[in-house]
Amino acid sequence: MAQRHLPALLIIMDGCGLAPADGENAVAAAKTPFLDSLYEKYPHTTLGASGEDVGLPDGQMGNSEVGHLNIGAGRIVFQELSRINNAIKDGSIAKNEVFVKAMDDVKAEGKTLHLMGLMSPGGVHSHMNHVEALVKMAAEHGVKTVRVHAFMDGRDVDPQSGAGYMSEFCAFLAKISEETGCDARVATVSGRYWAMDRDNRWERIQRAYDVMVNASDADVDPVAGIKAYYEKDPRGDEFVEPFAAHNEGIHEGDAAIFFNFRPDRARQMTRVFTDKEFDGFERKQIKLSHFVTMTEYDPTFDVEVAFPKTFPENVLADVIAANGLKQLHTAETEKYAHVTFFLNGGIEEPKEGEERVLVASPKVATYDLQPEMSAPEVTEKLVAAINEGRADFYIVNFANCDMVGHTGVFDAAVKAVEAVDDALSKVVPAILAKGGFALITADHGNADHMFDVASDGSKHPFTAHTTNRVPFIIVDEKAKLTGIEDGRLSDIAPTMLTMAGIEPSAEMTGRVLATEA
């Protein structure tokens, strides 16, 4: 067995990515004397924290949930969108038991399969590739009638792009119908403003629901209907008023698949279809043979889920506990779930020997008003715990760069970065004084890009995450990089365990980026 090297400290500077100092980068603009000294003295590299490096589609920004899940798992954890894309790519979607059962039953009973969701290539709530794959699967499965209830986007894509991709989709349906004999058509069209409300404005949902479930004599070309709405309201697709294109209605014994993979704007419509106690408005209640959701929208919903949540096993916290060691996880409120639930592989219950320290986030309207947030209090409690020797592994999240970055206020974001630097100047010496080592990283970028610059030179606040790589600093006198250039977040846990003299779990496919010289 390798010699133990403890205590170990993992510092996650939430939202602190790496980018050139271009005047839009609060991380580069901040005065960070302590971090600068670490870069000069200790081995360091960068890690991928977005796209395929964290189980997301290529080019998609990371986030705190995904970042912490990958950090703790020590392997790439594929997210729902990537899992669905992979199932389509390798053909395994055709064997998905939930889809197959729904299609078997409507085929046997001569009923209709209804597909509803956001008709968009945006990839934020849904993807057109997914509904096309479902139509094709149903046709090949022998389903005779497929009706699509299309919710138009206009937010995650250009406001008036819907007519173009609806035209392509209708051509796809016509081709499928001709080749297979399956009668596949667009039944209804609704802007997401109506069909995907998430603020309990039930009158909006009702407008879309009533059009979907009630039969209509209308025979409207979906593309023509959308274009007609553009002339009425140039705001475009998001606000397209619900209309029937070719709709016989939704009837008892039919089956429905909601193909959105993101839950938040799919929950209300799902409730109307499935909640027997629903009282948001007077509705025509229909007993469907199946109501399938692409992913889990809410664990309390009475639905079938095609791609249920999966969580990794034998993560960092499990390995620490299995070795009889103590661990302490700490953060302020805004990131407490990330450094506990998500870091621990989606498990709420603390591990054996795990202590959790929650510090309340400040009660301010927006965090640019207090950019240091609760970093001083988190720091004070963590340093005290280290000095008392309360754990073998310490894991801390500093929320500042992310939460203040989201406000879009550049000067405040600079102060947030400086507050994190000040915190590090206290916690890192504390762990070194105990003969331990520290790993410093981030879960994704944010404060590293605070403005978009328009063609006329004007600046507009950029409040989203970035796809930039994140830092990885190994604060240890004896550490030596292994030379891997394309590190990613999933390499952190194997590296930390190896440096501590502990064998990573067999499930950890991440690589070791540094060892003891």
Which residues does each PLM region occupy?
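Feature captures the catalytic ectodomains and active-site-proximal regions of enzymes
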Residues: 1-517
